[in-house]
């Protein structure tokens, strides 16, 4: 097999392959003979179809398969011998004017780039930290109490206030016509908790059971109901019942209902703190990991293989269509979505992936079995039966591969933080959790 390699662009290469026709024909004959043993054709007994008949019927398709296989094998061998790391699939075309007894192909493809990572000691990384405070524990307990609240009807004549559960009938009209979803009876919601539009809650707040009120309500431009978005409706609402919320006391009974073994408030707070600390750890790691990756990419020089970018765009496009389909959008799989919408994100992902892969290779940051086990144990710790979760992860290679990817990212994060110029910044628990 004759092979030549040519550089076309920064990452684009061309391999010219010449294969002897005798080798191709020999393989075609061999496959046709195997096919003749099993092929069934009218007028012939199984395995007794003459070779010339088999060749006439299947010769073209078998020759096509053999050419594909032989060229693919030759390309893989040539790329390997030339130490070329191929990115994506090659574009293979047959050349005219091949020497007698030969068939010649051009394979045009891209290679993965050389990744140059600069001096990480000059990289600036802001590393955040946060603590679980008593206030955070108190807030979590309040949330747990709200989840277990009960309601009792208020005395007649008592106005509705924030935290109350109200039962109402309402009807909204736009230009005198009731619209879809604009009418309901015995509808319940909690006042002041954002379950309804602010104007609706403001109108109901202060009303008493048995009272009715009319008021205008302007739907926001970005309202999810497209038929009413940006329009103003006239509402009639009647309050039928007002119920006050009663939160359980923070005591042994609450602790036991939440599964605290010793049934003490101290045990409850300790359990909440442990869970919050686990969540804080994961969120801090995610935030700091993002800062590290941005710093790492800023110190790297590389060209992006278009084949890898296009493949990533295709994945993002497929994900977007799947999301539209899940939302109930009709013909989501045929939706016209411009590829360029995803190009910046695809380029970032490909660039980061190549840089991380090079750092891992150059510094042996691969996940060890001990690290995998420790990470899975940590993930399983928050479940009722951790041992079942551990078995679930280790029982599937794909799930374990996802854990391995996370551990490698953690190794990269620790490596860069050890080398870079790190600025420590303490933030509040609420800021980390994205709470106001």
From Swiss-Prot:
Family, similarity comment: Belongs to the FKBP-type PPIase family. Tig subfamily.
Domain note: Consists of 3 domains; the N-terminus binds the ribosome, the middle domain has PPIase activity, while the C-terminus has intrinsic chaperone activity on its own.
InterPro entries referenced in this protein's UniProt entry, alphabetically: PPIase_dom_sf, PPIase_FKBP_dom, Trig_fac, Trigger_fac_C, Trigger_fac_C_sf, Trigger_fac_ribosome-bd_bac, Trigger_fac_ribosome-bd_sf, Trigger_fact/SurA_dom_sf
BP GO annotations: 'de novo' cotranslational protein folding; cell division; chaperone-mediated protein folding; protein transport; protein unfolding
Enzyme class of the recorded protein, top EC level: isomerase
UniProt function note: Involved in protein export. Acts as a chaperone by maintaining the newly synthesized protein in an open conformation. Functions as a peptidyl-prolyl cis-trans isomerase.
Full protein name: Trigger factor
Cellular compartments annotated: Cytoplasm
NCBIfam families to which the protein is assigned, alphabetical: tig
Gene Ontology molecular function terms on file: peptidyl-prolyl cis-trans isomerase activity; protein folding chaperone; ribosome binding
């Amino acid at each position: 097999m004759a092979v030549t390699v040519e550089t076309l662009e920064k990452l684009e290469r061309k391999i010219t392959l010449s294969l002897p026709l005798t080798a191709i024909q020999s393989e075609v004959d061999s496959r046709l003979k195997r096919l003749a043993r099993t092929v069934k054709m009218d007028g012939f007994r199984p395995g007794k179809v003459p070779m010339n008949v088999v060749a006439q019927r299947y010769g073209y398709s078998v020759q096509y398969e053999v050419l594909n296989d032989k060229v693919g094998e030759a390309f893989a061998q040539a790329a390997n011998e030339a130490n070329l790391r191929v990115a994506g699939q090659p574009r293979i075309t047959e050349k005219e004017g091949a020497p007698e007894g030969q068939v010649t192909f051009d394979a045009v493809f891209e290679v993965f780039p050389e990744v140059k990572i600069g001096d990480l000691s000059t990289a600036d990384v802001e590393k955040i930290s946060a603590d679980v405070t008593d206030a955070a524990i108190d807030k979590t307990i309040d949330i747990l109490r709200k989840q277990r609240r009960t309601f009792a009807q208020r005395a007649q004549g008592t106005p509705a206030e924030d935290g109350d559960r109200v039962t109402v009938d309402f009807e909204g009209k736009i230009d005198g016509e009731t619209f879809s979803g604009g009418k309901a009876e015995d509808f319940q919601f909690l006042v002041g908790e954002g379950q309804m539009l602010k104007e609706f809650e403001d109108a109901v707040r202060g009303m008493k059971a048995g009272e009715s009120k009319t008021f205008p309500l302007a739907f926001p431009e970005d309202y999810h109901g497209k038929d009413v978005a940006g329009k103003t409706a006239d509402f009639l609402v009647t309050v039928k019942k007002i119920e006050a919320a009663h939160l359980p006391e923070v005591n042994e009974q609450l602790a036991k209902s939440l599964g605290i073994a010793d049934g003490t408030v101290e045990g409850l707070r300790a359990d909440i703190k442990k869970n919050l600390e686990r969540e804080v750890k994961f969120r801090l790691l995610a935030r700091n990991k993002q800062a590290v990756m941005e710093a790492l990419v800023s110190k790297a020089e590389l060209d992006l293989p278009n084949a890898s970018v296009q493949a990533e765009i295709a994945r993002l496009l497929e994900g977007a269509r799947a999301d539209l389909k899940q939302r109930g959008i009709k013909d989501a799989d045929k939706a016209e979505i411009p590829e360029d919408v995803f190009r910046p994100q695809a380029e970032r992902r490909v660039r980061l992936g190549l840089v991380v892969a090079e750092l891992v290779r150059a510094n042996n940051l691969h996940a060890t079995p001990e690290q995998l086990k420790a990470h899975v144990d940590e993930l399983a710790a928050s479940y009722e039966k951790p041992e079942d979760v551990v078995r679930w992860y280790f029982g599937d290679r794909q799930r374990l591969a996802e854990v391995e990817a996370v551990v490698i990212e953690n190794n990269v994060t620790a490596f860069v933080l050890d080398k870079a110029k790190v600025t420590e910044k303490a933030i509040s628990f609420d800021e980390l959790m994205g709470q106001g």
